[in-house]
Amino acid sequence: PLLQALAEQLGPWTVNGPVRHVAQSALRDRQQQRQQRERLLAASQRLEELLRRHGWPPAGGSALFQRLVDPRCAALHDYLARRGILTRQFEQPASLRLGLPADEAAWARLDAALLGFKEPAHA
């Protein structure tokens, strides 16, 4: 009964003490928030430009990802996955969501993979 009551109070997404401390500090640090927003927006713009350069103009996105809407998205999803680049695939409409690469090595891998992608043969 006690554990059940506690679980009902806390809910399924509890946050431990150290994480709460870090989160509270981050929420108070306005300069860090501004810098993080600027960094994310710059990275998102970089991703948009990279995709456009390879013939994949984004159909929208946010500071955290870019979205592609194209009939070839399923093939691109599989191709990137085989190269260790994970994307989020949607079927209707055929689309992909690509998150921001984590570091320069990941940016280079994505660039090389997009360069090597060949459109699937049509039946």
Where are each of the predicted segments found?
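PLP-dependent aminotransferase class I/II
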Residues: 1-51, 56-57
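Residues that cap or initiate secondary-structure elements
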Residues: 2, 72-74, 104
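A short, ordered amphipathic alpha-helix with a cationic face
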Residues: 11-12, 82-85
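Residues at alpha-helix caps and immediate loop-helix transition turns in enzyme cores, especially N-
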Residues: 19, 32, 72, 106-110
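Conserved PLP-binding catalytic core of the aspartate aminotransferase-like
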Residues: 41, 48-83, 96, 100
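Short, flexible turn/loop "capping" segments at secondary-structure junctions
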Residues: 58-59, 89-91
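PLP-dependent enzyme catalytic core of the Aspartate aminotransferase-like
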Residues: 79-83, 90-123
